[in-house]
Curated annotation (Swiss-Prot):
Example of a GO biological process term: lipid catabolic process
Name listed for the protein in its UniProt record: GDSL esterase/lipase At2g19050
CDD domains in UniProt: SGNH_plant_lipase_like (cd01837)
GO CC terms: extracellular region
Keyword Secreted: yes
Active-site residues, Swiss-Prot/TrEMBL: 38 (nucleophile), 316, 319
Major enzyme class: hydrolase
InterPro entries: GDSL, GDSL_esterase/lipase, SGNH_hydro_sf, SGNH_plant_lipase-like
Signal peptide: 1-23
UniProt keywords, alphabetically: Glycoprotein, Hydrolase, Lipid degradation, Lipid metabolism, Secreted, Signal
Species of origin: Arabidopsis thaliana
Amino acid sequence: MAEAIFKALLLVIATTAFATTEAALGQRVPCYFVFGDSVFDNGNNNVLNTSAKVNYSPYGIDFARGPTGRFSNGRNIPDIIAELMRFSDYIPPFTGASPEQAHIGINYASGGGGIREETSQHLGEIISFKKQIKNHRSMIMTAKVPEEKLNKCLYTINIGSNDYLNNYFMPAPYMTNKKFSFDEYADSLIRSYRSYLKSLYVLGARKVAVFGVSKLGCTPRMIASHGGGNGCAAEVNKAVEPFNKNLKALVYEFNRDFADAKFTFVDIFSGQSPFAFFMLGFRVTDKSCCTVKPGEELCATNEPVCPVQRRYVYWDNVHSTEAANMVVAKAAYAGLITSPYSLSWLARL
């Protein structure tokens, strides 16, 4: 715990150095591809028949382009990573991108997306991890992106949260919590993850950052439904731990088996501490900044929001504020929460 807090404080000290150093280097990687769920989605769900879309106010209240489908008040983690990699613009969503954009980068992430195909099906149309990879294959082949270029691109993946939030801990219409123990479910997810990660490798991915699942039991949603009035829902966090442990092991397995590639694990879970958040300027860690109606997860349309967004960790009942996204993105870039490589080191390869 002390180490995590110390690393978080180091992040604050290091932040101002990044902008100056990176400005002189120019774009760090030739292209950047994003896969995942609502934490990374920047508009793909806008055109889908789904309740998992946020192209309305107050989402985007602190984003220059307003509501775009990002599940936050401002920039999400891939946006900030794109800035740190010195891209001239944010990586566009797949649903609005031409094949030619595959030469620069595409965001395939979809709110509600999961490792399991049935995850989040009660929300409507969702682009699963498997389908995101299929879309990526189609785009890079249509655009005829050279393999040597794909080998130099950055790939970030954030997937798995919905397999717990909108599957395992939501019994109806799902039955996974009846079929699997915590360890068995994690093993099942990792088996699929291994296959999908191998597919990305075959498609040219050689610089890959795999984000673990955060402390879902500390989200306002799970505190309300599983917390029992005593803070974070310990059972939910306990369920996630074997997944993160196995995912980190998978990263090391791939580094061992594929010597021409570098994979790194981004450990969000271990770095989440109320005290560390407090030391970074956050004052509210268990409530949403925006107005969320009882039993709901997303912000209510055009309802009041908290006066100082940067003091809140959570924007709605699940998703982080831009300020919290900034902490995660810069910590991953600097290597404060990654193993074995920082994102900045991956970019230099």
